[in-house]
Amino acid sequence: VRFLLGGYTADGGGAAEGIGVLLAGDPDDASAAGELSRRAATAVRADSPSWITWHPSLPVVYAALEHRGLVQAFRRIGDESFAPLGEPVAAGEAVCHVAVAPSGDTVIAACWGDGRLVRIRLDGEGRPVTAADLAAAEDPYALGGISATPPRPSRAHHVRFLPRNTVATTDLGFDLVRFWHGDGGQGSRDVVLPRGTGPRHSRWHPSGHLFVVTELSTELYALAPDPNGQWRVVGGVPLSPAALPGDAAAELAFSRDGRYVYAGLRGSNTLAVLEVRGDGAELRPVALVDAGVEGPRHHVVVRDTVLVAGQLSHEVVALALDERTGVPGRARRRVDAPSPTCVLPAS
């Protein structure tokens, strides 16, 4: 399988030179269980493309150029090469995530540095053309009279397009999961998580629940809409009773049958494994395993393999996954990769 690698370049204190290319076994094989290798040449040079994602129907990748505060589109011009498509679009300070609407006409960018959510319109070729901010978040705890000195900053971090023309975004600084309908012009309906949890990333589960991992409290929450369409928390557990103080949660991924959830923990450098039970709202911690890297920033599941990006150890490793128990084993393959932050299947 062929993958693209996002990473930090020199402007972000990293060693990458742009978007890289990773191979797991044969490029045309559906399994990622083979030898890992990395192409010496980058797919395209870019400044700290820390998050990358595909257009749903075009051969175009969008990158959050985090330390430049820009979103750039790249068109595929070969199996392992890309070229810029249009000019980069200004987003906001420390833009850290981008997601593309299923319709393919809109990108929404989340900016950790200043809390902005920016809606970027695309033309028919996938080229970014215009940008506009969505409504800014407000700290629900400050509005409720719980003050902080200095005031807590908004930290928009993740965007997820959901069924029924809904978008979910997280605000790590204000402990919010925000739900938007349509293009977001009518504002958001917000779910407030406990103060200091720090919602980071989300995943839509086949059961109809949105799972949200909290970076600061290292928990997993299940959210669902009520019959009136109002979202609410319906379940939640710590990622693991063995998580260490100071751990910071990172990415979420599912086993291919959706029965297990995998959450990265930076600090202890582990992956927490949780089982999804009942109607999807019941979550049970199963195991905490060695991620095989330092700084497990991102991971993806490909059949019976978990690929983990070690941002601080400058490598990607492959963990064998026991699909019966859902528990990954120790790293069986590894390859050097400069400051990797995102692993994206390339086809």
Predicted regions located by residue number:
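Short coil/turn segments that connect the beta-strands within blades of beta-propeller domains
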Residues: 1, 57-59, 103-105, 164-165, ...
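Conserved beta-strand positions in repeat-built beta-propeller and related beta-rich domains
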Residues: 5-13, 63-67, 109-112, 162, ...
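Beta-rich catalytic cores
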Residues: 15, 48, 94, 155, ...
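Short loop/turn segments immediately following beta-strands, especially the blade-tip
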Residues: 22-33, 74-81, 120-131, 181-184, ...
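Surface loop/turn motifs at the tips and blade-to-blade linkers of beta-strand repeat domains
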Residues: 41-47, 87-91, 148-151, 191-195, ...
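Asp-box/WD-like beta-propeller blade repeats and closely related beta-sheet repeat scaffolds
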Residues: 82-158
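Loop/turn-rich, solvent-exposed surfaces of beta-rich toroidal or solenoidal domains
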Residues: 246-311
